[in-house]
Amino acid sequence: MGQQETSRLFLALWPDPALRHRLREARDAWHWPRGATPVDAGKLHLTLHFLGEVPTGRLPELLDGFAVPFEPFRLALGRPVLWPHGIAVLEPLAEPPGLLALHARLSETLLALGLQPEARAYRPHVTMARRAGSVAAPEPGPAIGWDSASYALVESRAGRYTVLRDYPTS
């Protein structure tokens, strides 16, 4: 029996070009040590759920299944933090109830579709770099406002991200 083809998928808030530019500026405010790997500007996003490898044959079902109603919300990203293992992130100043409600609704949807949400606690963030060592986080600048009116199902393949479907607010 041959190996089943899979797609590496995640659900995310996907920034528009203007917001992506501001996120890139925030990423570039860090002074990265040698060996750090800043995230390419085209890949900056806020993950809602990482699904991992999913059988590609399930994509039609999942594309429709991930459409859940939600209310738009506003994020204020403005807390640069270095996480363990050299992960540099930009966290929101507060976790909007709308973001947490969307995350919870998508968790329920994952279970209904026979997929398992991650067990670890949800910590919303935008990853700025990996292998950042012990870099000092820059002084917080003005918060970056993110008016979220949609989320996306994204495929990661060979280092490239492709938005498979955008899900606007209800």
Regions found by a protein language model. Give the residues of each.
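Histidine-dependent nucleotide/RNA phosphoesterase domain, centered on the 2H-phosphoesterase fold
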Residues: 1-170
